[in-house]
Amino acid sequence: MKFKKIFYLFVVLIFLTACKNEKSHVIRFSTGEVYKFETLSVEVIADEEKMTTREIFSSKDNGEKLDEIINLLIKCKVVDQGYSYDSIPDHNSLLINLHNKDEEDTIYMYDSIRDRDTNKFHYSFYGKLGDQESPTLLSDDDLISEIKYIVDK
């Protein structure tokens, strides 16, 4: 009798574990790297002196806008850290936080100025992406303006 109860309890536990609803999202960058995350938030610099941020978007209950942001990010080319350059965040900057269970990675979008050498917009990814640690994302589009437009509509 005890064996049956333990067996049924075990079956119910397996069933509940299988039914657990964890929705993850995937960004497949144009260069083939794949990044999985659970939620995404967008922040702006609220106070430049104190370097505080304010959240302007969260992917929770905002699936349509999240899909639009992902569709912009998948166009980015992932390159090594050598393409990044120092920049100071200001009120025009965006921070995209990608949340997983145990960690958070961030894409820093400092300015909307094309690089003279590559003629592309450079954004810094802080975290591990593929086999690279803290790579640079290159884009033909001004993602800061486009993401702000998506968030504001």
Task: Describe each model-derived feature in a short phrase.
Residues K20-K153:
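Function-determining sites in protein domains
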Residues F15-A18:
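C-terminal motif of bacterial Sec signal peptides marking the signal peptidase cleavage site
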Residues M1-F7:
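Bacterial N-terminal signal peptides that target proteins for export
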